[in-house]
Amino acid sequence: MIGQIILKALSSNAKITVTVLTRQESSSTTEFPVGVTVHKTDFSPSSLRPLLRGQDVLISAVGGTAFTEQKKFVDAAIEAGVKRFIPSEFSTSSEDDAVIQLLPLFQQKRDIINYLKEKEEEGLSWTGIATSGLFDWVSCLLLPRLIYYD
């Protein structure tokens, strides 16, 4: 879901070249916008490195089952010369201890942020984007009569 939102926003800007990396075994029938390059990969370091060469930024939009896999992305990005990494930190900040208590899975997000801090000295900058809750998703699916938008 968040990946599609990011893709739509970035691909609408003609000054940005967008490349999407997707799982080899994905059966998704998603139609990608014109001009977007799509590579299917097994996400191994050896397959990621050549796909990341020449890229300025790597945005990870993986879900909860793949938070820890982002370490491979970080390492491959450094080896390929990527300048900035944006981890899948979307939603509530993993820096908040109360969040970790409520959502233990977010410890994996915090671990990635700590890993990125360690890797800064290797030339990779990073940005964590904590959007808080995705209220439009909550209001549409879980609480359709609680929150209204005009």
What function would you assign to each model-found segment?
Residues M1-P33, P45-S46, F67-T68, A80, ...:
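Oxidoreductase cofactor-interface core, primarily capturing Rossmann-like NAD(P)-dependent enzymes
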Residues T19-L21, H39, I59, I86, ...:
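Hydrophobic/aromatic beta-strand patches that form the interior of the parallel beta-sheet core
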